[in-house]
UniProtKB/Swiss-Prot annotation:
This is Glutamate-1-semialdehyde 2,1-aminomutase. InterPro entries: 4pyrrol_synth_GluAld_NH2Trfase, Aminotrans_3, Aminotrans_3_PPA_site, PyrdxlP-dep_Trfase, PyrdxlP-dep_Trfase_major, PyrdxlP-dep_Trfase_small. It catalyses: (S)-4-amino-5-oxopentanoate = 5-aminolevulinate. It is an enzyme of class 5 (isomerase). Its EC number is 5.4.3.8. GO terms for molecular function: glutamate-1-semialdehyde 2,1-aminomutase activity; pyridoxal phosphate binding; transaminase activity. Its cofactor is pyridoxal 5'-phosphate. Pfam families: Aminotran_3.
Amino acid sequence: MSLSPKQEQLFKQASKHIPGGVNSPVRAFNGVGGTPVFIEKAKGAYLWDVDGKRYVDYVGSWGPMILGHAHPDIIKAVQTAAEDGLSFGAPTVHETTLADIICEIMPSIELVRMTNSGTEATMTAIRLARGYTGRDKIVKFEGCYHGHSDSLLVKAGSGLLTKGEGEPTSKGVPADFAKHTLTLPYNDVAALKECFAKFGHEIAGVIIEPVAGNMNMVKPIDGFLQAIRDVCDEYKSVFIIDEVMTGFRVALGGAQSVYNVKPDLTTLGKIIGAGLPVGAFGGKREIMECIAPLGGVYQAGTLSGNPLAMRAGIEMFKHLRQPDFYSKLSAQLEKLLAGLQAAADEAGIPFKTQQAGAMFGLYFTDQEDITSFDSMLACDIEAFKKFFHGMLKRGVNLAPSAFEAGFISSAHSDEDIEFTIQAAKETFAEMK
């Protein structure tokens, strides 16, 4: 999609003082080509760019806008909070209220600590696992993203199961950090057991996205999450489920409630603040009591538990806890994905969709199942790029990467679904 001169000029201006013109790399459109669209405002299921063009949005600020953009109840809560003061650097009753809500909804969380982001939450959960166990090694999985802390920007090294060393995926990450992180194939129980057989007594914890959102959207195979629970129990390692993306998104109780698995620690992201900058980690009392000021594992943040995010989150949960909220959300997404699949089939284009609650993945492939990072890499990335730009041109905003999941909100109407399916029909016809 070619952008207006105004958009091109804005990107040029942004690139003058912002590295790459963006404040988060995926926004640069490197995964799909072209120049990013500059957004002016959002409301409900829609975004409007600086030229006034409207888009049906399936990114939702990367997941947290589950009620849609600028929901009036959330806006009112934030405005009321702002009138009382933006930040105090002191406790408020709203932190306690939100903590109570989270612990009630997720029984695996007995104590919870607020942070400023999902990255902070996962970074501290790793530190906490190490502090609790007195061990150094961490296990993670291909295709799972846990933020940009040094310990987690690591891929599998050639000597993983001989030397137990991973390799940094970013410059600036010391090899001494990476060597303590073991990266395994997602959904591979045999590799998990082999890793623990060799390094189990050195492993502080295992961290995983229960539904992997950094290889589009891949669900765990039957028994995979329980296998992690079992080896962590056997070797007394900490099981960390990263629900920054899935928490309160795939179900009210998160993915852990869907797959009936109980972690030792859980990390959460900005959805708990209705999209404002916030995160959290929580879990077993005996582990969480290792965090300062109760224990020797340090974590702090001036804006942790900031009143705007707390009060927005409290208001949001009133909607999420309605009895039929998630069933309606899931049904609406099923309707969308069925329509997209039918449109692709009619055009004769190999295409597959996957769904977990209100989270989805789109793949250009004739594979029956997408269960790993390797199967994701076997998909047609070039076809996705064409599809992305065709949909964007027709007023549908998808994640600008074949490796990112999509999201639907309660604001998406039947008309929005039909509009999207029609845009897909036209785009698929163009791709034939």
